[in-house]
Design a protein with these regions (language model features):
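A short, conserved structural fragment
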Residues: 416-426
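Flexible, acidic/Gly-rich N-terminal and inter-domain linker regions that tether
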Residues: 1-55, 104
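C-terminal scaffold of the Radical SAM
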Residues: 47, 77-100, 107-402, 456, ...
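Short, cationic-aromatic polyanion-contact patches
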Residues: 183, 307, 428-445
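Basic amphipathic alpha-helical segments that dock to polyanions
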Residues: 393, 410-418
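Canonical Radical SAM [4Fe-4S] cluster-binding loop centered on the CxxxCxxC motif
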Residues: 53-88, 181
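Short, amphipathic alpha-helical interaction segments positioned at domain boundaries
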Residues: 435-461
Length: 461
């Protein structure tokens, strides 16, 4: 059986609603609190240094010149390019403060610039930021690392792409969302297919290793027909990876979303139709379903890692670098170092002012206990490999699986009867009909979801 086999079952999807955590971490960021601070971070960095663990760096650039109404990211909308300078000064301080607690022998296997719009920065600013990172951390200079950056095609031309390649980036992620002009107007992101194609042509010519495109379904004025056209156009661009996100309309939490007319949003039935059609189109075009909104061509390293059962998941999404300690730099950035999760202040002024006084801007986080570590491993296995061998967990954590999770058995048996999973005394296998619903299976093992929440998340009969 092909690993990417997934079966569409509308009845199951309606019963096991898709709402729930995306499990880029366990425990999820909802559990972070202010008890965790810089002292914990220094402690974790010391452990990382002693173990000489490899690193994955995430750098957050919060600025955007224009607002996209659907966006739920931490961002600052400004046309004033001068806003970047004071931020970069503080970011450089943070880089220095963190790096002095680590060993130069710790290789940076993965680097990702996200935002906001990283290409909001001028060429000189990008050069200087990368120079600071190279000075402070052990960046690989043989192009063997996974060094990626998020690109807004409206902000990037050939010279920008050339600069990024020269600075060591070898992966790009392109926000596209939808190509239909009516949808683009409704979300205030006007971006032509030509602009996107130009960036992709540049990336290919400059030998970037991997191109990812992001799409969103469920946006205002989208219909199954016009979204299918967007997907066809995107398939023609042949990205190595695709992310197809479900738009979550939460105007009470995200101010820009209040400018979206909720009457123009597609119905839940239309959204399901879009997702089903997208999966069919991408599968026919040779893409593998990796899980949780992600697709990749079979020769992409995510697909290969999944075949070899070494895929992992962290705040950067699916990754082949889950063994690295993740260091988040910049406003709102999250780090995962050993058993510590910690997040910088999400308020730009607070972030800048704290660093101005030579203090790190850690504002909240969480230290995993033994139960968290065990459940984290279970959820990782399910969400990355669609299977879980009890013996592996028993061996790693010195427990009896069925004894430890006995109270969950009735729920798991219910899922087995419904055809989401196969369950026996040795393993859980997520079946093709359950793969789109893998987060519902993970939620069974989430100790932080209240019982009533769990019901609300899973079954919407």
């Amino acid at each position: 059986m092909m690993l990417d086999a997934i079966r569409w079952d509308t009845d199951l999807i309606r019963r096991y609603d898709l709402a729930g955590p995306r499990y880029t971490s366990y425990p999820t960021a909802v559990q972070f609190d202010g008890q965790v601070g810089t002292f914990d971070l220094f402690h974790a960095l010391r452990d990382s240094r002693k173990a000489l663990r490899p690193l994955s760096l995430y750098v957050h650039v919060p600025f955007c010149a224009n607002i996209c109404y659907y966006c739920a990211c931490n961002k600052v909308i400004t046309k004033d390019r001068g806003r970047a300078l004071p931020y970069l000064q503080r970011l450089e301080q943070e880089i220095q403060l963190i790096a002095c607690h680590l060993d130069p022998a710790q290789k940076v296997e993965q680097l990702h610039f996200g935002g906001g719009t990283p290409t909001f920065l001028s060429h000189d600013e990008l050069r200087q930021l990368m120079a600071q990172l190279r000075k402070s951390f052990n960046l690989l200079d043989d192009d063997s690392g996974d060094y990626g950056i998020e690109i807004d095609p409206r902000e990037a031309d050939w010279s920008t792409m050339g600069l990024l390649r020269e600075l060591g980036f070898n992966r790009v992620s392109i926000g596209l969302q939808d190509l239909d002009p009516a949808v683009q107007r409704a979300v205030n992101r006007l971006q032509s297919l030509e602009e996107t194609r130009a960036v992709i042509d540049a990336a290919r010519t400059l030998q970037f290793r991997s191109i990812n495109i992001d799409l969103i379904y469920g946006l205002p004025r989208q219909t199954p027909e016009n979204f299918a056209r967007t997907v066809d156009e995107v398939i023609n661009l042949q990205p190595d990876r695709l992310s197809v996100f479900n738009y979550a309309h939460l105007p009470e939490r995200f101010m820009p979303q209040r400018r979206i007319n909720s009457d123009e949003l597609p119905t839940p039935a239309q959204k399901l139709e879009m997702l089903q059609s997208t999966i069919e189109q991408l599968t026919q075009a040779g893409y593998r379903y990796i899980g949780m909104d992600h697709f990749a061509l079979p020769d992409d390293e995510l697909a290969i890692a999944q075949e070899e059962s070494i895929l992992q998941r962290n705040f950067q999404g699916y990754t082949t670098h889950g063994h690295c300690d993740l260091i988040g730099l910049g406003v709102s950035a999250i780090s995962q170092i050993g058993d510590l999760y910690c997040q910088n202040s999400s308020d730009l002024n607070q972030y800048q002012n704290t660093l101005a006084s030579a203090q790190l801007a850690t504002s909240r986080g969480l230290l995993c206990n033994a139960d968290d570590r065990l459940r984290r491993a279970v959820i990782q296995q399910l969400i990355c490999n669609f299977s879980l061998e009890f013996a592996e967990i028993e061996h790693a954590f010195n427990i009896d699986f069925q004894g430890y999770f006995g109270e969950l058995w009735p729920q798991l048996q219910g899922m087995a009867e419904d055809g989401l999973i196969e369950l026996d005394n040795e393993r859980i296998t997520v079946l093709p009909a359950g793969r789109l619903l893998v987060r519902s299976v993970c939620m069974v093992f989430d100790a932080y979801l209240e019982q009533h929440n769990r019901q609300r998340f899973s079954r919407v009969i």
